[in-house]
Amino acid sequence: MSDEDHDFAHQGGGDNASKTYPMAAGALKKGGYVCINGRPCKVIDLSVSKTGKHGHAKVSIVATDIFTGNRLEDQAPSTHNVEVPFVKTFTYSVLDIQPNEDPSLPSHLSLMDDEGESREDLDMPPDAALATQIKEQFDSGKEVLVVVVSAMGTEQVLQTKNAAEK
């Protein structure tokens, strides 16, 4: 069976060439990352089928999109490469929350890293509960730390931390 017999959305490089690197499907680990349908995902379950009469063992991958939380599944021969995203996490202090002129859009965040560098290009997270938690902590006068995850050209606030956890 050739690769053309499969619809591997995670093959090739395309626009994500420098945002991913290849790894043998059989080398993936639970808790690691993989691209499925062009989306960066965290692996939550892996299973390997036995080698069949046509050669390769198959790896079944169950993962969640790191930005949306959607569950995705894929399969690949264990010896074939899949794309793995470069995932980076950063912790920032929230300096200010500026409401958007359009109330239907998320508020903008003013953030500062440990070196004192500021940035104002991120919005409140789409997760309403997390956005509310950030706003309530900020409004109460507490120092608010947010964890920003960056992968495949997307950056998003995914959680808050206590200042003591820094």
From Swiss-Prot:
Q: Which residues carry this modification: Hypusine?
A: K53
Fetch the CDD domains from UniProt. Answer: S1_eIF5A
Question: Where does the record place the region Disordered?
Answer: 1-20, 101-122
Mention one GO molecular function: translation initiation factor activity
Q: What cystine linkages occur within this chain?
A: none
Gene Ontology terms: biological process: peptidyl-lysine modification to peptidyl-hypusine; positive regulation of translational elongation; positive regulation of translational termination
Acidic residues: bias regions: 112-122
Q: Which Pfam families match?
A: eIF-5a, IF5A-like_N
User: Where is the protein localized?
Assistant: Cytoplasm
Query: SMART domains under this entry?
Result: eIF-5a
**Which keywords appear in this protein's UniProt record, sorted alphabetically?**
Cytoplasm, Elongation factor, Hypusine, Initiation factor, Protein biosynthesis, RNA-binding
Function text: Translation factor that promotes translation elongation and termination, particularly upon ribosome stalling at specific amino acid sequence contexts. Binds between the exit (E) and peptidyl (P) site of the ribosome and promotes rescue of stalled ribosome: specifically required for efficient translation of polyproline-containing peptides as well as other motifs that stall the ribosome. Acts as a ribosome quality control (RQC) cofactor by joining the RQC complex to facilitate peptidyl transfer during CAT tailing step.
NCBIfam families reported in the protein's UniProt record: eIF_5A (TIGR00037)
Tell me the protein family, please.
Answer: Belongs to the eIF-5A family.
Protein name as annotated: Eukaryotic translation initiation factor 5A
Originating species? Leishmania mexicana (strain MHOM/GT/2001/U1103)
